[in-house]
Swiss-Prot record:
Family, per entry: Belongs to the RuvA family.
This protein's encoding gene: ruvA
InterPro entries according to UniProt: DNA_helicase_Holl-junc_RuvA_I, Hlx-hairpin-Hlx_DNA-bd_motif, NA-bd_OB-fold, RuvA, RuvA_2-like, RuvA_C
Name of the protein: Holliday junction branch migration complex subunit RuvA
Domain comment in the entry: Has three domains with a flexible linker between the domains II and III and assumes an 'L' shape. Domain III is highly mobile and contacts RuvB.
Protein keywords: Cytoplasm, DNA damage, DNA recombination, DNA repair, DNA-binding
A GO BP annotation: DNA repair
Subunit structure: Homotetramer. Forms an RuvA(8)-RuvB(12)-Holliday junction (HJ) complex. HJ DNA is sandwiched between 2 RuvA tetramers; dsDNA enters through RuvA and exits via RuvB. An RuvB hexamer assembles on each DNA strand where it exits the tetramer. Each RuvB hexamer is contacted by two RuvA subunits (via domain III) on 2 adjacent RuvB subunits; this complex drives branch migration. In the full resolvosome a probable DNA-RuvA(4)-RuvB(12)-RuvC(2) complex forms which resolves the HJ.
Domain I: annotated span: 1-67
HAMAP family in UniProt: DNA_HJ_migration_RuvA
Region Flexible linker: start-end pairs: 147-161
């Protein structure tokens, strides 16, 4: 599965209501669908980096791109809700910033949620009901187009030997995978006191170690 791409923007494409980029990486052109607000800062020939969610089907695969891992992971949370497919998930992220979207779901703001293409009242209600508690563990800076998503209460984790950005990404990823707050905290403390502690800036190392602890036979 493709999770991340860095390459040269070759061209912009548009088909129906969908649009995106062809990105050249090591001699291969990848067609990636993005929300239009992600496209605006990118000029032709520019080097771009996108985080990828890949959807595999019998007739091929589709790539959905995001400017950072936080938005990609939020997209994955959205499409985990029954009836929310990739196109609707992308439409939700198109309609407002990630921070505003999280706020709307937590507040049950149906008016804002239904502004997204393909989202009716029932779908908006389902989003609010199923994700309110899950997203309530995240904080988002209001009205930020570059949202900073993090778990609200992490005061007890400040002493861990991991830098703030990897810590934030680790919490978000584990939450996206369905782990509860308490499980995440226990895993991170266990990794921090283990025999082989990952480097403070090694987010992937912390993730692998946390998942090993969470999936240990006695867990």
């Amino acid at each position: 599965m493709i999770g991340w791409l860095r390459g040269e923007r070759i061209e912009h494409w548009s088909q129906g209501g969908r649009q995106g980029l062809v990105i050249a990486c090591a001699g291969v052109g990848y067609e990636v669908q993005l929300a239009s607000r992600y496209l605006q800062p990118l000029s032709a020939g520019a080097t771009c980096t996108v985080w990828i969610h890949q959807v595999q089907r019998d007739d091929g695969s589709s790539l959905f791109g995001f400017p950072d891992r936080r938005e990609r992971d939020l997209f994955r949370v959205l499409i985990s809700v029954n009836g929310i497919g990739p196109q609707v998930g992308l439409a939700l992220l198109e309609s407002c910033s990630a921070a505003e979207l999280i706020e709307a779901i937590i507040d049950g703001d149906l008016r804002r949620l239904t502004q997204a293409q393909g989202v009716g009242k029932r779908t908006a209600e389902r989003l609010a009901v199923e994700l309110r508690d899950r997203l309530g563990a995240w904080s988002a800076e209001k009205n930020s187009d570059h949202s900073d998503l993090s778990l609200v209460d992490r005061s007890d984790l400040k002493s861990l030997p991991i830098e703030p950005d990897p810590l934030q990404d680790l919490q978000l990823t584990l939450s996206t995978l369905g782990y509860e707050d308490l499980e995440i905290r226990r895993a991170m403390r266990a990794v921090a006191t283990g025999e082989e502690v990952p480097a403070a800036n090694d987010g992937d190392g912390w993730l692998r170690a946390s998942l090993r602890w969470l999936n240990r036979p006695s867990a």
